[in-house]
Regions:
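Nucleotide-activated chemistry modules centered on ATP-dependent adenylation/adenylyltransferase
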Residues: 1-222
Length: 222
């Protein structure tokens, strides 16, 4: 099975790709859509650093910009996938019907399959599976009650997951970040030949939300 992986650099898209690898599927391409503004379909945090991720995975990266208008961003994904010798596309959709159904629509038009192995999985269980599989996941954006500036740059581990679980009970924070509570960037995982080291990053904080903007990374042997 040959598939293209829709990658944002975040935990869900890369863990979905890891599951594909466990199935024995061949990931032939990474595909990244870069929105020019806030998008319902695509992530924007540190999207420029998918390139070293694809390099570490040893696969070519297909990038396409989009103005992030509802129908245009679908057409841009279709254009990015056209002509690929693949059987399907894998994505990290967990709960967004908007995202999942639109990817399925594009795949149907292209005559390929859409795979969403994380769909409706328990968020806490997924995080623990990721950590157990060797994923090093940094939190790079927060926007929720209980998630202060100190969370920016934090690596998700068992203690972090326990805290997210408590915040879920107290403030209804989605443990997976599916409501936009937080965004992530994967520094290392079994898909990488080399891990990523952040050499320069800048924090921004305003009115209860913030980002960790990555400015420079380097690859390091494991």
């Amino acid at each position: 099975m040959k598939i293209a992986a829709l990658l944002s650099g975040g935990k869900d898209s890369l863990y979905a790709s890891y599951i594909a690898m466990q199935y024995g599927w061949e990931i032939t391409h990474a595909v990244t859509i870069k929105p020019e503004k806030l998008s319902w379909m695509y992530h924007t945090e540190n999207i420029d650093f998918v390139e070293p991720i694809a390099e570490s995975m040893g696969i070519p990266l297909i990038e396409r910009h989009t103005v992030a208008e509802k129908e245009d961003e679908l057409e841009d994904l279709k254009i990015a996938l056209e002509g690929m010798d693949i059987d399907g596309v894998i994505s990290g959709a967990i709960a967004s019907e908007y995202q999942r159904t639109r990817i399925e629509k594009i795949c149907h038009e292209l005559g390929i399959k859409s795979f969403t192995p994380l769909w409706h999985k328990n968020g806490e269980l997924l995080l623990r599976e990721m950590v157990g599989a060797g994923f090093e996941i940094a939190i790079v954006a927060v926007a929720a009650e209980g998630l202060g500036e100190e969370w920016l740059g934090r690596i998700i581990d068992s203690k972090c997951i326990d805290e997210l679980s408590r915040l879920n009970k107290k403030y209804r924070v989605n443990i997976s970040g599916e409501g936009g509570e937080y965004e992530t960037f994967v520094l290392d995982c079994p898909l990488y030949a080399k891990k990523l080291i952040v050499e320069k990053a800048e924090k921004e904080w305003e009115r209860g939300r913030g980002t960790l903007g990555i400015k420079k990374v380097r690859m390091e042997d494991k």
